[in-house]
């Protein structure tokens, strides 16, 4: 696994409480420059502030100059009355043997963009990907042997980690963006890494694409159309897998194997893939899935190593157990309070995991009770009610009754401001704390932090 570390942040002068608005991922290249400029023009009379977010990877010797260019450009636009606020973050990439530099840099970039967006109080980040990017993505995924989900390419909009990532120009040809840049005489930088043949996308763009477009002039549009069809097909597969998992009474932590084995093979494999993703397995490979499909019905072995952890069968149930990260030093102090104001993923490194909150119509905790939460360890004597009308019992007995193994009982107990127990990792929401039907509410679940 790999990671990155934010080392510094640079910003133009701003008030202590910056106005809320939206953000644009701004590298300084042609596409993001055009998108930022167009967004500023559209926002000028709306009262919105547009936050230009720049990530300094340090991969190029010119990275400092690019940051300076982006900040200077935003200052010029601000002097012309455009509602821009520039923010930048430096990250240090940490690649390990076998890691893809492209993948590591991309993950670090999105993590930094999310951090910057949260700091500015915005929940919408615009990305400048266009139709050519989508066509290239489909080709790359096909060459990697991807399934329908990979062939779907990049979504036009997706919500992840409490942020909506949108690509408003995904159906726009590259030529239209080039024309926009010429029309407004926009200044942008040329990233020399785009000519580096070590990267697969660059080889495709520089060596394959010219020949492909010469032979098939409509390739960009038709490949993007194919990606849209694949997105619809992938959505159907995902919906069916979700229905199958619900029929199996699966949760994000547990897959009941007896019910799963009743599925037809072509449905079982997609249900298994979806469950693995929900359980926190990082991109299960085709070989992983083939092995599991062959060995799970046979009943042996009891453990399967996967990237980032291992699968374990326990009392007819399948669980994923992340591998402890020996390189991570646990914080000296655990988080003791938390405010959940909306759905999202809340990292709690002191407890070694992530609390996931999702808006639901039933089975959740009243949103009003989540404004002030107390996080506490097990001390003994806690009582948990699993179902309405059933007696509350000790956590030990509830864990045993639910067949939750010891290694799946980590994480904090969540108490409301009135001192009532609301949520227990591995067991869920206490029945006494559940919201009434129709009341705004959030479902909670606990996920161990990924390794690396």
From Swiss-Prot:
EC number: 6.3.4.19
Record key words, sorted: ATP-binding, Cytoplasm, Ligase, Nucleotide-binding, tRNA processing
Class of the enzyme per the UniProt entry, highest EC level: ligase
Subcellular location: Cytoplasm
Comp. bias intervals (Low complexity): 1-20
GO molecular function (one): ATP binding
Residues noted as binding ATP in the record, renumbered to the chain: 27-32
Ranges for region Disordered: 1-21
Cellular component terms (Gene Ontology): cytoplasm
SUPFAM superfamilies per the UniProt record, alphabetical: Adenine nucleotide alpha hydrolases-like, MesJ substrate recognition domain-like, PheT/TilS domain
Recorded superkingdom: Bacteria
Catalytic activity: cytidine(34) in tRNA(Ile2) + L-lysine + ATP = lysidine(34) in tRNA(Ile2) + AMP + diphosphate + H(+)
GO biological process: tRNA modification
A Pfam family this chain is assigned to: TilS_C
Principal location class: cytoplasm
Family: Belongs to the tRNA(Ile)-lysidine synthase family.
Entry text on domains: The N-terminal region contains the highly conserved SGGXDS motif, predicted to be a P-loop motif involved in ATP binding.
Function: Ligates lysine onto the cytidine present at position 34 of the AUA codon-specific tRNA(Ile) that contains the anticodon CAU, in an ATP-dependent manner. Cytidine is converted to lysidine, thus changing the amino acid specificity of the tRNA from methionine to isoleucine.
Protein name, entry field: tRNA(Ile)-lysidine synthase
